[in-house]
Amino acid sequence: MPRADQSVDVAIIGAGPAGLTAAYLLTKQGYSVTVIEKDPTYVGGISRTVEMDGFRFDIGGHRFFSKSQQVVDLWNEILPDDFIQRPRMSRIYYEGKFYSYPLRAFEALWNLGILRSTLCMASFAKAKLFPNRNVRSFQDWTVNAFGHKLFSIFFKTYTEKVWGMPCDEMSADWAAQRIKGLSLWGAVVDGLKRSLGLNKKPNDGMETKTLLETFRYPRLGPGMMWEAARDFVVAGGNQVLMAHSFKQLAQDQGTGRWRMVADGPDGDVIINAAHVISSAPMRELAGRIHPLPATLPEAMDLKYRDFLTVALMVKGDDIFPDNWIYIHDSKVQVGRIQNFRSWSPEMVPDTSIACVGLEYFCFEGDGLWSSADADLIALAT
């Protein structure tokens, strides 16, 4: 039998960054809130930090950066004393060579060689003189911006790994958003300055995101931010129910209130709420609202790209100094490799052990997603 109704102002589906930010702000305003999270242990969603024997592993490590002062202020409020400033070092691995990312002009020219560098510049000139006027795809946009040769070297392979589809089938809008503010000329000028040691601009959050030299990071990984947000919500008298999966959502047409059912370890829990905030995938949400929405077929057709991280603990020094390395090699499936100590030294407490995370992009249910742990470890090593 379902447990007795919990009556709250707001019910929230998912204890990831979106759900916990909403819960945090609502708790500050004095609202009653219940959050449900299907993971039995960790909050933070894709931004969680997994712990084993004192070692910490980020599922999807990314630097903390925002041009919104409101967002930065919120981060500082949740974690007032736990951000550290880290030097950014990331590289691209392509055809057996490493390229600094963002590019360093002299290094890139040397690695590519005179012939290929000349072809890249000729390709760029051609794109500027004869641009594609009918830009529809990621490939169209990127070729127009950088030329076909640079597109094929530094964009095509990695992007297709991430999204699992050809670049000429991806929207140009995504390219404009993801690579906004970055041009070949800007990258070359910035690369020249850094190659000569002349780039001394402070990391004030107002430079092009792709060119940032340093970044802020929670000292124990991003998961500690969402753990702190959860603790604040609970300390404020609200609930974060772990190991509770979203099951059903229906609205009372008379009162306008919502009846949400969650499946927990001890059976169903019913939450009665004036409002509901969902951070669940749209397919899951649409399929569990009753009555079913008219747009259900469209919602169920939405596709999501999934990924998994294979974390390895290796005896010895760090394998590389970078925060992460992009693998632009179509011969291997891995897309990015993280160095957890380079994110924060406190995440790897034993200096005799190196910890890396190999990221693989896949679709839920495909061969990679369904692989046994032993097979994934073998693939990663």
Provide a role label for each language-model segment.
Residues D5-Q6, Q29, H244-A372:
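Mid-domain catalytic core of redox enzymes
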Residues V8-V35:
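N-terminal Rossmann-like FAD-binding beta1-loop-alpha1 element of flavoenzymes
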Residues A18, T41, R283:
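Conserved Rossmann-like nucleotide-cofactor binding loop
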Residues T27-V50:
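Glycine-rich FAD pyrophosphate-binding loop
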Residues E51, D58, Y93, L241, ...:
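A general beta-strand register signal
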Residues D53-F130, D140, Q177-K180:
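Dinucleotide-binding Rossmann-like beta1-alpha1 core, especially the glycine-rich loop
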Residues Q70-Y101, A145-S152, F232-V240, K247-W258:
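Feature captures the FAD/FMN-dependent oxidoreductase FAD-binding
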Residues L119-A122, K126-A250, G256:
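Active-site/ligand-binding neighborhood in enzyme catalytic cores
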